[in-house]
């Protein structure tokens, strides 16, 4: 284990030598193919990847989803078959059957090991078939669970058009006006109703990046609208043809998830955008910090955030009272751990350890500062953050500190439950709506569920969920 020097008041960083004990990053296909409606995802891997996708997303197979598996065979691995010809055949078939606006190739562990030159093949094939091909490497050797989305969005960031590349005003409106069209549905025509005062202040264009469900996108966009901030677009957009316009040196960008560090780097370095370093909008405190950081960067004075945050805390009073004084241990899986730990500390919980597969301190700087401030305000000891934790050592620490709840990946949940340790799957927080003011209750409800179950079992005279034989 390697310890890194920190101030006495800040988080204590350590790094162990464990592997990525996380869900496979190619699972990002599950939500991205639904988010980008005119896309097609082609996962290039072995039978193992196919089995994983069938198990993870098998319920969707009868709906003819917009993803497929390009299964590598022995001839591909030993280079007897021409990779270009095989991918050309598959992409032409996809074009004929679905005619998507973009095809996304997802590289896996096998394509990484045999050094398949997907980035070299894609531009030639793109010119030939006339459909953009985006290459994203989401192999489990180099990336943790949610970083699959990060690699896809980082690859798509370079496809965002500059203002001079958008030819017509109609296309410009299509790329910037999708959300406003949705919000104005059912309202009177502004031309007929007469001119209305502008709801927005004058500021530089803002693009938000991160894949969230449409209701959460609408909520966060409306929260910024209350501050007079117009969101120019989201990455990913609902359609590939609606990717946001990015102007070098002018456009500001902000992330909504802590695992999008490569996307942030791509937008900042390749596209020359101005990155706003923010806490992440998880919990009322994080959402307020996210809005305040964006307002400060754009020169907008925030208003009404004290009342808005207090309103949410009042609604969460019962959950906070239940969780206060209880302890939690994060084993590490989805890279949301630091933001979740900060919110749970604010709710009065004790966090023994935050395990995390990968930590980008520059991208999460504002989140770490908010975590430190939260600990100091509530008298919580400095949080121990362990990067790439070793599971054997973690289990010894769990036995030593005896937490009320362990938030862990699915692989470890049942073995820990069999040893009398209460667990919650971290993957549930990835797929649930936990961002923004109004969804804070849903996250606390998920944290409460296994603890409520224990109370119910005790009322029946059971001490553990799994009975020893």
From Swiss-Prot:
Sorted UniProt keywords: 4Fe-4S, ATP-binding, Chlorophyll biosynthesis, Iron, Iron-sulfur, Metal-binding, Nucleotide-binding, Oxidoreductase, Photosynthesis
SUPFAM superfamilies: Helical backbone' metal receptor (SSF53807)
Pfam families: Oxidored_nitro
Name of this chain's protein: Light-independent protochlorophyllide reductase subunit N
Similarity comment: Belongs to the BchN/ChlN family.
Pathway assigned in UniProt: Porphyrin-containing compound metabolism; chlorophyll biosynthesis (light-independent)
Sites where the protein binds [4Fe-4S] cluster: 24, 49, 109
Oxidoreductase recorded as keyword: yes
EC number: 1.3.7.7
Catalytic activity from the UniProt record: chlorophyllide a + oxidized 2[4Fe-4S]-[ferredoxin] + 2 ADP + 2 phosphate = protochlorophyllide a + reduced 2[4Fe-4S]-[ferredoxin] + 2 ATP + 2 H2O
Cofactor(s) the protein needs: [4Fe-4S] cluster
Single Gene Ontology MF annotation: 4 iron, 4 sulfur cluster binding
GO biological process: light-independent chlorophyll biosynthetic process; photosynthesis, dark reaction
UniProt organism field: Gloeobacter violaceus (strain ATCC 29082 / PCC 7421)
Domain of life of the organism encoding this protein: Bacteria
General function of this protein: Component of the dark-operative protochlorophyllide reductase (DPOR) that uses Mg-ATP and reduced ferredoxin to reduce ring D of protochlorophyllide (Pchlide) to form chlorophyllide a (Chlide). This reaction is light-independent. The NB-protein (ChlN-ChlB) is the catalytic component of the complex.
Record PANTHER family: LIGHT-INDEPENDENT PROTOCHLOROPHYLLIDE REDUCTASE SUBUNIT N
Entry-linked Gene3D superfamilies: Nitrogenase molybdenum iron protein domain
Keyword Transport: no
Cofactor note: Binds 1 [4Fe-4S] cluster per heterodimer. The cluster is bound at the heterodimer interface by residues from both subunits.
Binding partners and assembly: Protochlorophyllide reductase is composed of three subunits; ChlL, ChlN and ChlB. Forms a heterotetramer of two ChlB and two ChlN subunits.
